[in-house]
Regions:
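Oxyanion-binding/catalytic loops of NTP- or PPi-dependent enzymes
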Residues: 1-73, 77-83, 92, 99-563
């Protein structure tokens, strides 16, 4: 029975495990350690990963991506005739990762360590654990992504004592943490972040700018727009440290060409960089840590590879940041190391990881009877160490009051209703004059970020509430499980077929004339030989299709302008 580490990412997800003194990444059924966090539905079959990503170029209405950004919300995704929540889509990704891990390790997965953004709130953490439950994965511990990154850094550098600022800039989230490492302890001092800021936002800015410069693209349909977004994203990643890179996009019989430049990215990304500056300052302020007390600034996450972001961080801290090798794999490595610790592997040093509460948790109180809007009374302030428990005393505000309603809120706003309401407790009290009767309210927050609130009145009657933040009922979970089980997760052969078919469909859209007809013929023969069970002929056609894809791609690339 194996324990694995999972980096459930906005753009890509990874699986890792500890073996023979090192952490290893597990390849998926397509041979890659990166599994795109993309889901696509085709009738009663569900595709997850690269095949789903390719289908998204030509079947956008049946495909969903970047749904991690909406964990903890009630957003719905309609894929074909089916409707999914972000939690259900995440469950499908986790199910695929578990299947690939079990196939590779040749043993069942007993448990998973799943990483989450440090700035994930209670709802988002609860939904992540629920997604794991739907995928048939037992999760004892969620760990924050910067904690995992710090663990990977400390293990790689064999560095015991250090104060680190970890900047985790992914596809859809930004986490900034001040981390202190000493002896065998990795202690989070403070976190800040934005759950809706990442590389996807850079992509959107590039897309908007490109569309404004090229009005001839205004009539692009959904699939054409998806193709352009993909081309711009690939160019952004390929730019590296070059000053500029040509983007060439073909739609129908027309081709549009333009450069993307470092200067352009810097100009478009100024609001993002200013947000990063503000969040770095907030984390350091909360940690009571000055710039000269930071030993290293660690950059992880796929979007940390963007050179204009690296330059900004270097200017901000007056030193080059440590950009971890393969930034998009660092968090997964940290999760795998922690999986080894959970397994009590003899060849790994035991480490204790502490976390903090990312948001203030409190209740609603009335300070002034003239003001009918309750204020927030902080109970656990942001960045208090976990686990943490605190008790406060609350009193009635009305004469002969029989009930007290305790709202439970998360956030930093002054007025209670401007924060996120996690739930409420109702508890009876003795009828007395205002202020003469009270209750004791205890907030307890554990290391996994699970909150329990307890209220006790003068008669020692206790009302407990485990906050699960609008989590589904057992009946709703069962209904979701039934829906997901009805969708068939394809085997390796079907997944490979879907990947080739999706690539051929995309190629068909790029071509004209004879080449397009050849691709159409390839699509037809690939489909019919498979459906008719002509195995030997299908294998032959499949290999021909692979060769055709390579040749056609080389032909298209020949028309790309020199940078």
């Amino acid at each position: 029975m194996a324990i694995i580490g999972i980096d459930l990412g906005t753009t890509n997800s990874l699986v890792s495990y500890w073996k023979e003194g090192t952490v290893k990444l597990i390849p998926n059924s397509m041979g890659s350690v990166l599994t795109p966090s993309v889901v696509s539905v085709m009738q009663d079959e569900i595709f997850v990963g690269q095949s789903a990503k390719e289908r998204g170029l030509t079947h956008g209405s049946e495909t969903a991506a970047s749904f991690k950004r909406f964990m903890g919300t009630k957003k719905k995704y309609q894929l074909g005739s089916q409707i999914f929540t972000p939690t259900e889509l995440s469950a499908l990704v986790l199910k695929k990762l578990k299947q690939d891990a079990e196939a590779y390790l040749n043993e069942p997965v007993e448990e998973a360590i799943i990483t989450v953004p440090a700035y994930f709130n209670d709802r988002q953490r609860t939904d992540t654990k629920l997604a794991a439950k739907m995928a048939g994965i037992h999760v004892e511990r969620l760990i924050n992504e910067p904690s995992a990154a710090a663990l990977a850094y400390q293990t790689a550098r064999n560095q015991e004592d250090a104060v680190l600022l970890v900047l985790d800039f992914g596809g859809g989230t930004l986490d900034i943490s001040v981390v202190e490492c000493f002896e065998n302890v990795i202690e989070i001092e403070a976190v800040s972040g934005d759950n809706h800021l990442g590389g996807d936002d850079v992509d959107q800015l590039l897309y908007k700018d490109f569309m404004e410069k090229h009005s001839e693209l205004s009539l692009l349909d959904e699939e054409g727009a998806a193709g352009l977004r993909t081309a711009l994203t690939e160019a952004k990643c390929a730019l590296g440290k070059q000053d500029k890179l040509m983007v060439s996009y073909t739609y129908g019989t027309s081709t549009v060409e333009d450069y993307i430049t470092q200067e352009q990215l810097l100009e478009l990304g100024l609001p993002i960089l200013e947000r990063i500056r503000h969040l770095c300052a907030q984390a350091m302020r909360d940690a009571k840590c000055k710039e000269n007390e930071i030993d290293d600034v660690i950059m992880v996450g796929g979007s940390s590879q963007l050179y204009f972001v690296q330059r900004f961080i270097e200017e901000l801290f007056d030193r080059p940041p440590v950009v971890m090798d393969k930034t998009d794999k660092v968090v997964a490595r940290g999760a795998g190391i922690y999986a080894g610790i959970r397994m009590r592997a003899a060849d790994i040093k035991d480490r204790m990881m502490t976390d903090v509460c990312p948001f203030t948790l409190g209740t609603n109180v009335v300070w002034d009877k003239e003001d009918d809007r309750p204020h927030i009374c902080p109970v656990l302030e942001r960045n208090c160490p976990l686990p943490f428990s605190k008790t406060i005393q609350l009193y009635t505000t009305g004469d002969y009051q029989e009930l007290m309603r305790v709202g439970i809120y998360q956030g930093e706003a002054y007025y209670a209703d401007e924060n996120v309401c996690l739930g409420e407790l109702l508890i009876g009290v003795r009828r007395r004059l205002a202020g003469q009767e009270g209750i004791r309210v205890t907030f307890s927050y554990d290391i996994n970020g699970v909150l329990q609130v307890e209220a006790e009145n003068a008669m020692h009657q206790v009302v407990k509430k485990l906050i699960v933040n609008d989590a589904l009922s057992e009946k709703e979970i069962e209904e979701s499980l039934i829906q997901l089980e009805q969708l068939k997760m394809p085997d390796k052969e079907t997944e490979e077929y879907a990947l080739i078919h999706a690539k051929l469909e995309w190629l068909y859209q790029q071509q004209t004339g004879t080449a397009r007809n050849q691709t159409a013929g390839m699509l037809y023969h690939l489909k019919t030989t498979r459906e008719e069970g002509k195995h030997h002929l299908y294998v032959k056609v499949k290999e021909e299709a692979k060769q055709w894809l390579v040749q056609a791609s080389m032909y298209l690339d020949a028309f790309e302008p020199e940078n």
